[in-house]
């Protein structure tokens, strides 16, 4: 019985890895062994950063809300506490968008939060 080397399967697998490594710097997009390692590492980075992205956006929203709240002589934490006590249930993403795009609406929210804290 002749020995089967599986050339087409191996070539296809290697070609797939090299295709995934397209655009990488140096030998990482041409040499199979190095490309394979980099594709694995890239996958780890992608997995980690999909979770990190959620934390980064939340930080950004909080920073924006804090900056807008301080223009109305109020800190972020007092604003959020006031909104909660006023029964205004709005998430940070939407609050951040309101702070950027609609100053008047945000000012009204701040006054309602201030009233609820009194």
Curated annotation (Swiss-Prot):
Q: Cellular component GO terms, alphabetically?
A: cytosolic large ribosomal subunit
Query: Which CDD domains does the annotation name?
Result: Ribosomal_L20
- InterPro entries from the UniProt entry: Ribosomal_bL20 (IPR005813), RIBOSOMAL_L20_CS (IPR049946), Ribosomal_protein_bL20_C (IPR035566)
Q: Give any single GO term for biological process.
A: ribosomal large subunit assembly
- Please give the Gene3D superfamilies that the UniProt record associates with this protein: 6.10.160.10, Ribosomal protein L20 (1.10.1900.20)
Keyword terms, alphabetized: Ribonucleoprotein, Ribosomal protein, RNA-binding, rRNA-binding
**MF terms in GO:** rRNA binding; structural constituent of ribosome
Tell me which family the UniProt entry assigns to this protein: Belongs to the bacterial ribosomal protein bL20 family.
Listed PANTHER family: 39S RIBOSOMAL PROTEIN L20
Protein known as: Large ribosomal subunit protein bL20
Source organism: Staphylococcus aureus (strain NCTC 8325 / PS 47)
